[in-house]
Every structure is written in C-alpha cells, then in structure tokens.
C-alpha cells in the first residue's frame, strides 16, 4: 500500500518547525532553498522562515515526494 500525506500550509512558519511538521506526517525528503535568489546556504533552524512551498498545501503526495521550501532569514521580506 502506498504511503501518502496531505501537505500542510507551511507559509510563514520557521523552517525548523516546518521540517518537524513534515516529518511527523511521514515526509522523507525536504529541499530547503534560499527564496531571496542570493544562493545562500539554508540551514534547518528557526532563523529561516518559509515563503513558498511545493507541493502546495492540501495536495496529497507520496511520502517520498521532495518537498521544496523556499525561505528567507527571519526579518527579511519574502520576494
């Protein structure tokens, strides 16, 4: 039987909390990216805040689906 989960709305969440939420649902693959376009290395901690996500909230996906979270440093505006 295929294992799936419903993608939660992670926009505005600290990146570490977003990762925890995904892992609790069974997600096995996360790709954090710098939403600013500056190509900075993104660490999974509370210093980064999620701006966009793919797949979108509400989509039903396989646990092996790569979830892309584009984030900016806390205090920065999302592009």
What are these model-predicted stretches?
Residues 1-79:
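Ligand-recognition elements built from short beta-strands and adjacent flexible loops
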């Amino acid at each position: 039987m295929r294992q799936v989960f419903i993608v939660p709305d992670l926009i505005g969440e600290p990146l570490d909390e977003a990762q925890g939420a995904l892992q609790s649902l069974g997600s096995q693959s996360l790709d954090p990216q710098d939403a600013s376009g500056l190509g900075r290395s993104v660490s999974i901690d509370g210093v980064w805040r999620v701006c966009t996500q793919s797949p979108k909230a509400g989509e039903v996906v396989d646990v092996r689906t790569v979830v892309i979270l584009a984030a900016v440093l806390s205090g920065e505006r999302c592009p």
